[in-house]
C-alpha cells in the first residue's frame, strides 16, 4: 500500500492539509457520554485520500489506516458495505427552468465529483456480489436560507395558496397572487413584523397552542430576513417594500434538494457508464432500476451534523428490514431502539466526500455513527485548484473547531437522536439563534 506524496511542488498546501488532518485524527474516538471509561472506544477507520499523503502523516495518525483507491482495504469495504453515503456540498441557486419553478439549483463541482464516485463504487459493489447495498444521498441547505424556509408559511398565506404549492409556482405568479391578496384580503406583512419585534405576545398562551407557536416562529424568521438586509428597516418600511424584500429573498431560495439532484445525476452517470461498457438497454435498465430502488434521499439538512443525524435512522432501518424485521414496525421504532437491536451486528459504511470537507466528515461520522460501524472514507476527484482547496479547507477547519466544541462541550453527547433534536431546536425552534449569529460564530471561531 502506497499513499505517499510523489511531488512536493505545492508544499504550503500539503503542510496545511496534513496539519489539519493531524488535529482531526487526535480528536477521534471521543465519547462525552462515557468520560470515565478507562479504555477509549475504537473502530476500524480507513481513509482513501485522493491526493497522496506523506509517511510522516501516516505515522502521526496511527488511529487511521491509509489506503489506495485500488487497495485491498477498499475492495473489502465495498464488497461488505451496508451503505454508501454521498455527502452533499452546498448548492448554487440559478434561474429556475421554464415550466419547472422548483428546479432552480445547480450542483457544485464537489457534489458532482462525489456523485460520480458513488456511482462507480455502487457498480464495484454489485460486481463483487454485494447487490443489496444501500445508497444515501444527503441534502444541504445553506444556513442563510433557514429564515426563508421557516417563513415559508407566511409567504404561502400572503399568496393565498397552500405551503406545499409555493415552490411549484413561478416567481411572477407568486408576486401576482401576493399583490392580489393584499388588496382583496388586506393581508399586511407589517402587522406580522411588528408582532415579532415586540414582547406583547403571551408566551404561556403561545406555548399552549402549537399553531400559535408555529406562527410566532414564522414571524420571527420573517423579521430576521429583514434585519439581515442593509436596505430595509423592518419597523419603518412600507408594506410594499416588505413584500418586495420577501419576494427577493424567496427568489434566491433553493427549491429542490441537492439529494434529489445527486440521485438523478448518479442514475444518469451509471447508465452512461454501462452504455459505454457495451451493456444492452435491458441490462442497463435492470441495474439502474435496482439502484433507484436501493437509493434513499436524506431530507435537506443545515449542516454536516444534521446530514448524519438524519441519515443514521434511515441506514439502521434499512438494515433491520434486510434482517427480516417488519418494515411497519421498524418505522415506529426510535433511533435508540434501532441502535440497540443492531449493537452486535457489524456494519460497514463507505462515505464519499471532497478533499476539503473530508477531515470534518471523518470526525463527525466517527462521533455520531454507532460503534458497530466500520468506516471507510473515500475522497472524490474534485478538480479544484490547490488555492481553492486550501481556502475551502480553512473554512472547514473553522467549522470543525466550532462544531466539535458545540457537540462535545455544549451538547455533551454523541447519541445521534439527541444531537439531532438539539440541533433542530437550535436551527428551527422558537429559541433558535439568528442566521447572522450563526455566521458570526463561524467567522469568529478561532482555530486552536
Can you describe what each PLM-predicted range is?
Residues 1-11, 15, 447-448:
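Non-Sec secretion/translocation targeting segments of pathogen effectors
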Residues 388-448:
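Glycine-rich flexible loop motifs, especially short His-Gly-Gly/GGXG/HXGH segments used as catalytic or interaction
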Residues 10-402:
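A structural signal for short, hydrophobic/glycine-enriched beta-strand patches
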